[in-house]
Design a protein with these regions (language model features):
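Ligand-binding pockets and gating/stacking loops
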Residues: 1-475
């Protein structure tokens, strides 16, 4: 039965001493045992010799990462967030504005600067007839699975602040990231993997802040050609095997029983221990998840032998294994100049892999339960950037931006909202960043105003009580 919103429900999302029964500073300081070997048997659910249930990260786990049913009907169970860092130009990607061409090089009414129409053409694609830019030919093939939001806007068009806002829902420092909130609310389906994994990006985008540290994103620095031990540093313990580590766990369990009554909570130490525990658990599964050489050649070809191709293939493998939230960073969208060459380069890097991800998830029956989100921190101006570049570009614009979503319960083959005739600002059915965040949480089964965490005497929320669900994009 889906739990109602009650104090008990919220308390069950907060780790208790029973969940984190592992504070033993003296033991850690005096023992020579490696940290990676000291994962709590109680959290792993392991017997001394290990069990099939433990090895598969079964759903009968307890503790802060145990899976929890959302309080409301959910469309999506997992999220893949493709973050286009730098601020993609909406008019050069997903928001056609033919009126701009009539004013090329002229001053636009009500705007300061010379009009800069997109050099790229749009054409209707799919059964839905949504207009898609020529720089996204592969995504045009799957447009009937996608919802394009053309009326998104943000508060401050400065990179650091806007990136923080998109990823944490706050203009202030520090606040928990989107992935941390999601895993805090839902737990994760695989206890042998982190619930929140990032492939690139800044630490601030994956921070847990005042949430318990177990909800922080685990970053993986991946690059094509990397070996597994380079992708996942220190994933294995070179000094001992898993069997011996399990025996050590049994020994640690006995120490836990002896010292449980003396337990004193130490948040910083608990966070470090939880990280070491996860490192042990990942030995059994993470190496497999990140090894894309195990994929058929046909599948690797579908995604492409590129950085983004490999990262999105890994994202699918992670979601397939029960990881709740995966963020893939894709930088380079800060096009103050050279739009003519920069946009095709950037779009080309993500077009094929993102289309492959949609097709692959659909073929596996995972698209309906996996929400894919693409977008950056703001949009760009529709006038030329005054930076003196011979090849024109665009400046930052927080009043107009674009994002698309696919799978996870969104309506396919649709657009929502619109900018004005030139694309300078969101005008019709405006969607603020808080609205986008509220909609994401709704698709996952949460009322964004009721998913709270109490800290320093007040209840905090991802949206800080702002925002409205965009119901028209939900199927």
């Amino acid at each position: 039965m889906t739990p109602a919103y009650t104090d008990k429900y919220l308390r069950e999302h907060t780790p208790t001493l029973k969940d984190l029964i592992f504070t033993r500073r003296e033991f850690l300081e005096r023992t020579g045992m490696g940290f990676g070997a000291m994962s709590l048997a109680s959290i792993l659910g392991m017997s001394v010799g290990g069990t099939a249930e433990a090895d598969t990260g079964a759903l009968k786990a307890s503790g802060p990462l145990a899976p929890k049913a959302p309080p409301l009907p959910a469309k999506a169970k997992a999220v893949i967030h493709i973050f286009a860092e730098g601020g993609p130009s909406h008019v050069d990607t997903w928001d056609p504005k033919p009126e701009l061409a009539k004013y090329d090089g002229q001053t636009l009414p009500g705007l300061d600067g010379l009009a800069f129409p997109s050099p790229f053409k749009y054409a209707k694609k799919g059964k839905s007839g949504v207009e898609v830019c020529e720089v996204f030919p592969k995504l045009g093939e799957v447009i009937d699975e996608m919802t394009v939001i053309r009326s998104l806007w943000t508060d401050i068009p400065a990179h650091e602040v806007a990136q923080r806002f998109m990823n944490t829902g706050s203009l202030q420092i520090p606040k928990p990231s989107m992935g941390s909130w999601v895993v805090y609310g839902l737990g994760t389906q695989n206890q042998n993997m982190p619930g929140f994994i990032t492939l690139g990006g800044k630490p601030e985008w994956r921070q847990a802040s005042f949430l318990p540290g177990i909800y922080q994103g685990c970053n993986v620095n991946y690059a094509p050609g990397m070996k597994l031990d380079e992708i996942l540093l220190n994933i294995s313990n070179p000094f001992t095997g898993l069997d011996r580590q399990r025996r050590q766990l049994s020994f640690v369990r006995e120490l836990d029983k002896m010292h449980a009554e003396k337990l004193q909570k130490d948040e910083q130490l608990e966070t470090r221990i939880e990280s070491f525990e996860m490192a042990f658990k990942m030995q059994t599964e993470a190496t497999d998840a990140f090894d894309i050489s195990k994929e058929p050649q046909q599948m690797r070809d579908l995604y492409g032998a590129t950085d983004m191709g490999a990262k999105l293939l890994i994202a699918r493998r992670l979601v397939e294994r029960g990881v709740r939230f995966v963020q893939v960073q894709h930088g380079g969208w800060d096009t103050h100049g050279n739009v003519q060459t920069a946009i095709p380069r950037q779009a080309g890097a993500v077009d094929g892999p993102a289309a492959a991800l949609i097709k692959d998830l659909k073929q596996r029956g995972l698209l309906d339960s996996t929400l894919i989100i693409w977008g950056g921190e703001f949009g760009r101006t529709v006038v030329r950037d005054r930076n003196g570049n011979a090849a024109p570009g665009r400046d930052h614009n927080g009043r107009a931006m674009v994002a698309w979503m696919a799978g996870g319960g969104v309506k396919g083959g649709t657009t929502y909202g619109a900018t004005d005739e030139f694309g300078a600002r969101a005008a019709e059915n405006k969607v603020h960043i808080h609205d986008l965040h509220a909609t994401i949480l709704a698709l996952l089964g949460f009322d964004h105003k009721k998913l709270t965490y109490r800290y320093n005497g007040r209840d905090f929320r991802f949206t800080d009580n702002f925002g409205n669900v965009v119901k028209d994009v939900i199927a």
